[in-house]
């Protein structure tokens, strides 16, 4: 008799759990029907882009800090120099099949050239199509920081003039003279 009551109790408990879980709000999101803005959190780190400064020039100065900071080594670039002495990446390549979207490259970039967007649809049929070149990564705008220009903040050497000799430029300060 005890086994019969235990069996009936087990069946009743199972039916109770099925009905309580059956009428709950579902956790599964039907992605194509639901807009991506409802799925992706506000600070989601997705596809990597290269931005331009407010003057329209590339922000990247090919310092290679992003490639060093990348834990999986999916960034490769080659430095070149313009006539005015400014560095730029001759090629900039990101392998998205290896990228873990950690954001370390964005944090390491001193010019805010690398930024992560909330784009997450990077599926391709061929793995080689996930290797993005500079032309695929470079956008026409400044991204998250519209007013920041690296060379306005840091300055750039002028050919034929020493530091402090250019117009509206103060002479460099000897920090050791300030010590007690």
From Swiss-Prot:
All residue ranges annotated as the 4Fe-4S ferredoxin-type domain in the record: 50-80, 90-119
Domain of life: Bacteria
PROSITE patterns for this protein: 4FE4S_FER_1, 4FE4S_FER_2
Residues that coordinate or bind [4Fe-4S] cluster 2: 70, 99, 102, 105
Gene Ontology CC entries for this record: plasma membrane
Cofactor note: Binds 2 [4Fe-4S] clusters per subunit.
Topological relation to the membrane, as annotated: Peripheral membrane protein
EC number assigned by the record: 7.1.1.-
Required cofactor names: [4Fe-4S] cluster
GO biological process, one term: aerobic respiration
Pfam families in UniProt: Fer4_7 (PF12838)
Keywords, comma-separated and alphabetical: 4Fe-4S, Cell inner membrane, Cell membrane, Iron, Iron-sulfur, Membrane, Metal-binding, NAD, Quinone, Repeat, Translocase, Ubiquinone
GO molecular function: 4 iron, 4 sulfur cluster binding; iron ion binding; NADH:ubiquinone reductase (non-electrogenic) activity; quinone binding
Reaction(s) catalysed by this chain's protein: a quinone + NADH + 5 H(+)(in) = a quinol + NAD(+) + 4 H(+)(out)
Principal location class: membrane
Subcellular location: Cell inner membrane
Quaternary structure, from the entry: NDH-1 is composed of 14 different subunits. Subunits NuoA, H, J, K, L, M, N constitute the membrane sector of the complex.
Function: NDH-1 shuttles electrons from NADH, via FMN and iron-sulfur (Fe-S) centers, to quinones in the respiratory chain. The immediate electron acceptor for the enzyme in this species is believed to be ubiquinone. Couples the redox reaction to proton translocation (for every two electrons transferred, four hydrogen ions are translocated across the cytoplasmic membrane), and thus conserves the redox energy in a proton gradient.
Protein family membership: Belongs to the complex I 23 kDa subunit family.
HAMAP family cross-referenced by the UniProt entry: NDH1_NuoI
Protein name: NADH-quinone oxidoreductase subunit I
Organism: Acinetobacter baumannii (strain ATCC 17978 / DSM 105126 / CIP 53.77 / LMG 1025 / NCDC KC755 / 5377)
Encoding gene per record: nuoI
């Amino acid at each position: 008799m005890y086994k019969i009551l235990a069996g009936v109790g087990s069946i009743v408990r199972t039916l109770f759990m099925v009905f309580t879980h059956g009428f709950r709000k579902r956790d599964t999101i039907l992605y194509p029907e639901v807009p991506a803005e409802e799925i992706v959190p506000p600070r989601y780190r997705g596809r990597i882009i290269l931005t331009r400064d407010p003057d329209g020039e590339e922000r990247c100065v090919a310092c290679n800090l992003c490639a060093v900071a990348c834990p999986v080594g999916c960034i490769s670039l080659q430095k070149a120099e313009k006539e005015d002495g400014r560095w730029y990446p001759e090629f900039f390549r990101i392998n998205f099949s290896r990228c873990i979207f950690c954001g370390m490259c964005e944090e390491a970039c001193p010019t805010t050239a690398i930024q992560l967007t909330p784009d997450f649809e990077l599926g391709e049929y061929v793995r080689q199509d996930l290797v993005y070149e500079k032309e695929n990564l470079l956008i026409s705008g400044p991204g998250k920081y519209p007013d920041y220009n690296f060379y306005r903040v840091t300055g750039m050497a002028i050919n034929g003039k020493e530091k402090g000799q250019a117009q509206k430029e103060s002479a460099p300060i000897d920090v050791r003279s300030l010590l007690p």
